[in-house]
Amino acid sequence: MEVLIKNLSEADETPYDLLLLADPSREIVDDCISRGSCYKAYNIKSGIETVIGVFVLLKTRPETIEIINIAIREEYQGRGLGKWLVHQAIERAKTEKVKTIEIGTGNSSVMQLALYQKCGFRIVGVDQDFFVRHYQEEIYENGIQCRDMIRLRLDI
């Protein structure tokens, strides 16, 4: 499979179906896109481009950038593309001349926690009740209520 990364332009359709896999709040997703840079991953097959993944980078401090949304279309999951997409986000972040990349995920996001640590991120903190404070609806994954945000960091 050949995959290409492109920056989302104003003319492009926003891939809400993917962005909402990682964050169920359209309002929060819109805020993230307006403040950050959104990148789409395309599967290029027979001249047809299919969006299979997405990530959003946001510079939060002069030397820090955060991956604030990242997702792979469900039918493409389990093929190593999540790890590949995290590495693509890291490479894009490096072009911003930052020293630190951050990412956060829910306490119930077991697979994502494993993935980010395999990509070199280290747990640096827990924002207790983050999802309770910022989301009206309760979120459950893997039979666990998502309450706390686990914060991870990668020094580059």
Which stretches of residues belong to each language-model region?
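Short, flexible, glycine-rich and Lys/Arg-enriched loop motifs at helix boundaries
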Residues: V124-D148
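Conserved beta-strand-loop-alpha-helix junction that forms the acyl-donor binding cleft
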Residues: I103-L113, Q128-H134
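Acetyl-CoA-dependent GNAT
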Residues: V3-E75, V86-H87, D155
